[in-house]
């Protein structure tokens, strides 16, 4: 059975991608920071081989925790994302740093952390 790791899996594109793969027999490692939406996603997918991770990937420690918890996927969908709902020029340095890590640094850390395993498998895709 093929395995997909999907970040941002509790809504939007990530949720729809997870739904499509689940319907086509894939097992899923689903990551979301929103507990309520994670619960809804958990109830939406069938299969005993699915895993759910309630993690905020804007935090470096949580990316490391995820890397230590998942097996090598056949497919990585690095989809997690948020936006800042402030007017231009009103976001704090903390908000920008968190957003930057989630959308850029964390994605790089996740991919770099998986690369050795992905190379060994030779059939994995990002």
Feature annotation, model-predicted:
Residues 87-100:
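Substrate-binding pocket helix/loop in short-chain dehydrogenase/reductase
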Residues 80-85:
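Conserved NAD(P)H cofactor-binding loop of Rossmann-fold oxidoreductase domains
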Residues 10-11:
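Conserved glycine-rich cofactor-binding loop
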Residues 2, 73, 118-126:
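Active-site loop of short-chain dehydrogenase/reductase
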Residues 111-112:
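A short, exposed helix-loop element centered on a Lys and neighboring polar residues
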Residues 24-40:
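Conserved glycine-rich Rossmann-like NAD(P)H-binding loop of the short-chain dehydrogenase/reductase
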Residues 45-59:
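Rossmann-fold cofactor-recognition segment
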């Amino acid at each position: 059975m093929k395995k997909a790791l999907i970040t941002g899996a509790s809504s939007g594109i990530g949720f729809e991608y997870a739904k499509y793969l689940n319907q086509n027999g894939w097992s899923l490692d689903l990551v979301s920071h929103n507990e309520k939406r994670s619960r809804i996603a958990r109830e939406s997918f069938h299969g005993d081989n699915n895993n759910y991770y309630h993690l905020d990937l804007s935090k470096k420690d949580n990316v490391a925790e995820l890397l230590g918890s998942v097996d090598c996927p056949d497919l990585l969908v690095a989809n997690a994302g948020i936006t800042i709902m402030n007017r231009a020029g009103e976001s704090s340095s903390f908000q920008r740093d968190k957003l930057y890590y989630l959308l850029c640094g964390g994605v790089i850390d996740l991919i770099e952390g998986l690369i050795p395993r992905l190379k060994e498998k030779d059939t994995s895709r990002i």
